[in-house]
Each structure stands twice: as structure tokens, then as C-alpha cells.
Amino acid sequence: SAARARAGLIIAALTEYAAKRRFTATPEPPAALVSREGPLLFVVQKHAATHLHYDLRLECDGVLLSWAVPKGPSIDPKDKRLAMQTEDHPYDYGMFEGVIPEGYGAGIVMLWDYGTWEPESEDVDAALRKGDLKFRLNGFKLKGSWVIVKTHGYGGAPNSWLLIKHRDDWAGPINITEFAPLSVKTPDADFAEILSGRTPDIWLSNAPAKGGDTGAMYKKIIERALSMSSGTKSDSTKSDAKGTKSTKSTKAETAKPKAKAASKAKAKKK
């Protein structure tokens, strides 16, 4: 049956997922099939790996259907975003925020958005096979009606899809990834702050031993996160400095006419 075939595919996907992970050396959760009731979870994880990208994940049949979106989601219907389908992930991975070890996308994971999703397609499996899944999101940042469509190999890979926002009250010409770049799990945290201890349940309790290959790897990740953070702060400091300089020069220019007026007044009195 279709359900049995889907279950077989899910188990195969989780087996592939587990084969890439070393759970004794990482805070990332192990693969597990979850059976639960209630609204379906969706998450978008911002992943600073070799290249910054976003991972869209939709709960379905106990796992998370997953797509890597290089530029992140767009709420502008005109802006179709490439989404590369990846292996299904375990449900428990959905709320993960922390560090991924070397070997399968080493880097930092930020929980950029999460909430619930509802398929607008009656049969999700059939929609995926057809390559046209319509759904609604209700998250902190992403809401309303969406569609993810397969490109069917037109100049792309077999796993190439497009993530598109439908026109509704939640659409607009805003770059949502720039407008709202920070974590929704750790309030207003960037990558550097995720590593700095604001998420102790994930980062501090799984801190690697100093030295060795693992220590060197984490050192590089931390340095990269800090450079991202300092770059933003540095830009902000420059603008503040410019503002201060212009304010001082304006005050000086304003003071000159006053000084001239005062000297003229003294001359008249004499």
C-alpha cells in the first residue's frame, strides 16, 4: 500500500541520516520516528556552514521533510527561491539550535522561525510525487499560503524545487531574512551569541574538549561566528562615529556666526 511504501521510505531516510551522524560526539538528536497527534510542526533553521543557507522542514508522518534554501524564504511572490530537497530529518531535530560537528555540514544552527503548518493539498504524498505541494504556515516570521514546486530537471538537479509565496495578506516586497535575521528560540541572538552561552542547555553542556581536531574545528566555527558579529557591530560603530563627527562640525559651524555677531556688537559699542 502507499502508506506502507511511505513508511519504508521514512525508515530508509532515517537510516541514511543516522549513518552520517556520530551521536556520542554531538548535541544533535539521534534519528527516531515520532508518532504524535496535534498540529504539524514547521521550522526554518538558519545554518552557518560552508555557505550560509536556510533549511525548511515540514513535519509529515513522524519525520521532517527537508529542503535547503540557499537564499532563505522570501515573502515576495515575485521572488521564487531555489530549494534543494534533502533527506528526511527526525522530528526531535526540529527545535535544535547549536553546533553541528565536522563531516556533514559543520557549523552553527539557529532556529530562525517555527510554528505550525497545514497542507492545502489533500494528499501530501501524492503532491510530493507530483512535485506541487501547497500549504499554509503560521510562524513568527512566515505566515499565509505557500507552494513548493519541483523544477522537473529544467536546467536543475533532480532534487531541485522552488519555494514560492502566494499573494495574500502575509505577502510583501520585504527581504524578511534581512529584516528579521535573529533567533526565535534564544531571543534576539545571532550566531556568536548562540555560542556564547545564551543557550547553555545545548552549547555549554556539550562543550568539546580543548585541543585536538575537534577543538581546532570548534575554534574555527567560533572565530567565524565572532567575525560575523563584530562585522555588524563595526558597521554600526562607524555610522555612530560619522554621526558624532557631523554633529560636532555642525555645532562648530553654528558657533562661528554667533562669534562674528558678538564681535560686531562689541565694535559698535566702542
Where do the language-model regions lie?
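Catalytic cores of nucleic-acid ligases and guanylyltransferases
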Residues: 7-270
